[in-house]
Amino acid sequence: MADFYYLPGSSPCRSVIMTAKAVGVELNKKLLNLQAGDQLKPEFVKINPQHTVPTLVDNGFALWESRAIQVYLVEKYGKTDSLYPKCPKKRAVINQRLYFDMGTLYQSFANYYYPQVFAKAPADPEAFKKIEAAFEFLNTFLEGQEYAAGDSLTVADIALVASVSTFEVAGFEISKYANVNRWYENAKKVTPGWEENWAGCLEFKKYFE
């Protein structure tokens, strides 16, 4: 069984948990207390020099960065390739969505909310505009689409649903974006591990209360 170093409230950690559920892999979950500095202990830094979560250790093979872990789990354990198809064009669209999630959507969350939550900084209206722009892009991607990349659930949907659900608990109005809202409501029903994802979101919500 693979060791999984994580934090329940973390969106990237939740995307890995849902992906593992989708491919039927059980994770040996190891909770890290980042506020206590667990990630800086020498034994963890030896596993992951970047000392970040999530980190997976599968039979001695260590990997971090959630989207890399998602792809690894599907390629190694998926009974089919439906979550990350081998077709170059399908895979390219999934990769684009994953990079969009990492560099634009989730990044906009971090840039706007993290300074407020962790540094008690005032809200930055310019950073909020970046969130709105990211949701407009996602709304466009989802025009006429039930899924984020193609016609079935993929790792792109799983990564995006982890991010979008985090925006929901932060109080962002997802309903303003009709295509995103429709996709999100469906994703809640069809994404394996949604319940655990939502429990993690509620854990994270405490920072906003």
Swiss-Prot record:
Keywords: Lyase, Transferase. PROSITE patterns: GST_CTER (PS50405), GST_NTER (PS50404). Transmembrane segments: none annotated. Its EC number is 2.5.1.18, 4.5.1.1. One of its GO terms (biological process) is glutathione metabolic process. GO terms for molecular function: DDT-dehydrochlorinase activity; glutathione peroxidase activity; glutathione transferase activity. Disulfide bonds: none annotated. Glutathione binds at S10, H51, T52, V53, E65, S66, R67. InterPro entries: Glutathione-S-Trfase_C-like, Glutathione-S-Trfase_C_sf, Glutathione_S-Trfase_N, GST_C, Thioredoxin-like_sf. It catalyses: RX + glutathione = an S-substituted glutathione + a halide anion + H(+); 1,1,1-trichloro-2,2-bis(4-chlorophenyl)ethane = 1,1-dichloro-2,2-bis(4-chlorophenyl)ethylene + chloride + H(+). Belongs to the GST superfamily. Theta family. PANTHER family: GLUTATHIONE S TRANSFERASE D10, ISOFORM A-RELATED (PTHR43969:SF9). Homodimer. Conjugation of reduced glutathione to a wide number of exogenous and endogenous hydrophobic electrophiles. Has DDT dehydrochlorinase activity. This is Glutathione S-transferase 1-1. It comes from Drosophila erecta.
